[in-house]
Amino acid sequence: MNEPSPNALSRRSLLIGTATGAALAAGGLHAAEPAAPCCAATVKTYRSADFYDADGTFLVDKAREAYYDMFRRFQYPISDKLQKEMWILDFGLNDFAHVGMAGIFWLNRQDYKYFGHEIYLLPGQMIPEHCHLATDKGAPKMESWQPRRGMIYTFGEGEPTPDLIGKIPASQREIVKSRCCTPLGIDEVGDLNRLTAWHFMVAGPEGALVTEYGTFHDMDGLRFSNPQAKL
């Protein structure tokens, strides 16, 4: 069997959220969108119910449009590549307005052990708490985060920050182990405090676009503290 490309995603579920965007771009229904003109756009708020049908099926297209609306508000270009390759996850938790994300892997080089990723979070949205373990393919992932639009609350191991615990969505607040919070504004950089540490982030009230720098990311080393969370 052929080895996957070093840039390939290693979970089929990450590809599902890209399918409609790729189909639209391939069909010529979307050209690359330039940054929107400057305006005082209103921040939209969402309920998790907005992203599921009556049977509880996650509505990826509605989630995608919510991110696109945020991109336009932030004057962030919606390129052809982004339309084709952005993936969207609710982590199987059925609480997408509060726990979920979108993203794109710009590169993931096992051969040279480096990784580039953009993280997209709606207002108040959280990535589930997780850690990265060593695998047969590489060492535990190390990472740093730099907000480009909006701001984030990064949570990691260490002395708890009681006045910011309320930023954690209620559905995850009693599950997480990481209670030391460091807010990051535009172009501030935060780091994972040690290899294999538990960590997560929560977007501020406007949402967030975050550049992540890291070492090679093998999905087989990803672990969630919430036993219900999955890719």
Language-model region placement:
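Short acidic-glycine-tyrosine-enriched beta hairpin
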Residues: 160-195
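Conserved short histidine dyad/triad with adjacent acidic residue
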Residues: 118-138
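A short, N-terminal "cap"/entry segment at the start of jelly-roll beta-barrel domains
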Residues: 34-115, 171-174, 228-230
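N-terminal secretory signal peptides and thylakoid transit peptides that target proteins
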Residues: 2-21
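Short beta-strand His + acidic residue motifs that chelate non-heme Fe in jelly-roll/DSBH
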Residues: 128-130, 154-155, 191-192, 198-204, ...
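Glycine- and acidic-residue-biased ligand/ion/polar-headgroup-sensing regions
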Residues: 122, 140-160
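A short hydrophobic beta-strand segment most commonly corresponding to one strand
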Residues: 144, 200, 205-224
